Amino acid sequence: MLPRRDPRDRTSRLRLVRSFFKTDEREEGGPIRSPFVVGLGNPGRSYGRTRHNAGYLVVDELAKRHDGSWRKRKKAEAAPVSLGLTNATLLKPTTFMNNTGSALSDHRPENLIVVHDDLDLEAGTVRVKVGGGAGGHNGLRSIIGRLGNDFVRVRIGIGRPPA
């Protein structure tokens, strides 16, 4: 687990995200506990490749690229992977979006990196953020309701549908 710190200090979380993309030595500060990378989406074939399942699509691609195999858990599918110098567990909650928080209630927010779709970002845009509100996203609202908002989010822009 990451050490407790001032909630306004986002440095350790952002260092955790950057560690995924490093292939050389880790930054000073000691080992970081293996994070859970959570892809938000809805289970079932009818939702499989919809834009709102962008989180599922990202963790599926990470599992494919890093030889992860999905295993069923109580309320999620999990795939342990090695990402650069960091081991992580990819998670796909098997609850519907509005109940995602119940699938993550056993996890500490500081160990989560939540990947989700964002209507307000242009399609293909990616932003990393720590903390904040739900922004109208029901999956985030559910997680925040259970765990608070102190977790890393990777926002995947899907844009608004044409009017």
Segments the model singles out, each with a brief description of its role:
Residues 2-131, 140-154, 161-162:
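Nucleotide and nucleotide-moiety/phosphate-recognizing core
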